[in-house]
Amino acid sequence: MRKIASLFVALLLLAGCSSVPLTGRKQVLLVSDQEVLSSSLTQYNDYIKTAKKSTNVNKSAMVTRVGKKIAAATEDYLRANGMADEVKNFSWEFNLVNDPQVNAFCMPGGKIVVYEGLLPLVSSDDELA
């Protein structure tokens, strides 16, 4: 019975194995990319509904400007490395929230949030990036 259970577990692990496109290393996928994207979009939308967006037009414009440059560079990189089909998984959004914490985060699919508390520590677009 143990041999059968061990064989079953081994088969499950092998079925979930795949190669990382860029590096070729092996990975075990317990959750599909689509499930991750769907879940992260739900979590992001829940967060954005409760977060207080910044009213500072200049700072918000800076976050969007830098974000668009990062998005373009990311998409160029994916295309140049044979992963153009991954670009469809991104629906870029850039938000500045009115929160004094020094923080920022991104979610799968191109959802980026910057906290206002981070901006006094940067003096240029390059530093924010």
Go through the PLM ranges and name each one.
Residues 13-16:
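C-terminal motif of bacterial Sec signal peptides marking the signal peptidase cleavage site
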Residues 18-129:
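Peri-catalytic and regulatory segments of divalent metal-dependent proteins
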Residues 2-10:
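Sec-dependent signal peptide recognition
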